[in-house]
Curated annotation (Swiss-Prot):
Belongs to the conotoxin O2 superfamily. This is Conotoxin Mi15a. Residues 24-49 form a propeptide. Coiled coil: none annotated.
């Protein structure tokens, strides 16, 4: 009888853990579309962003126009960065 009680208790705990894990996963999936919608709205509110063209100085890659990256140009000490293909 004691073994049966322990077995039922263990089964209940395992089932509870499974149900809680499933509900957390569902909440995460529901939250994801809202995050993307927030990012899209934020981008629209900022408007069209001017990008830095090839050969012009930059500080980081996101400011460069598409297909360009902010790379060191010139001396081995890397004192000047510019947008390059």
């Amino acid at each position: 009888m004691e073994k049966l009680t322990v077995l039922i208790l263990v089964a209940t705990v395992l089932l509870t853990i499974q149900v809680l894990g499933q509900s957390d996963r569902d909440k995460h999936l529901k939250r994801r579309p809202k995050q993307y919608a927030t990012k899209r709205l934020s981008a629209r509110m900022r408007g069209h962003r001017q990008c830095t063209g090839a050969g012009y100085e930059c500080e980081e890659t996101p400011e460069c126009c598409p297909n360009l990256t902010c790379k060191c140009s010139g001396s081995p000490l890397c004192t000047r960065y510019s947008c390059q293909a």
